[in-house]
Amino acid sequence: MSQGLSFVFELLGACFIGLVAAVCMTIFELPFWKKWGIEGVAEWQVNSVIVSMLIRKFSNRRVSISMSVGMHLLHGAALGIVFRVLLTLLGTAIPASSILTYAIVYSGVLWIISPFLSRSLFERAGGFRMTERGVAVSFLAHNVYGFSLGLLIPVLA
């Protein structure tokens, strides 16, 4: 198989692994959502705003929780690809233990970007306030995503 085609299959695998990691993250978030509603999970609020901005051009429908979670899973899959590309840029002979560390750092950077740094932007656009506990749950959930991603990405090698 050509090297280019092999890399495409690796990216598809990374997409799937990103999706699985996002599912793990979502499973972690479910009890907080059940207890506190959408305010208990900051990235679901962020995704709700994104979905709202996308669908309001085509529909008057309100954003449902399933739409928000769907966008959340889509982001997880896409960010799995981004992580794999970043690993490729760092070099090919990275030990699995280092990949786990890189994945946790990567998920921390993702959390810093959204929801932490972009918090006020999404609050204004969505007309809501992110709670401290929702942001804290988001931080923990991003670590679950990074840990899952870091454990699964070496399977592609």
Descriptions of predicted regions:
Residues 1-157:
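Juxtamembrane/disordered regions of integral membrane proteins
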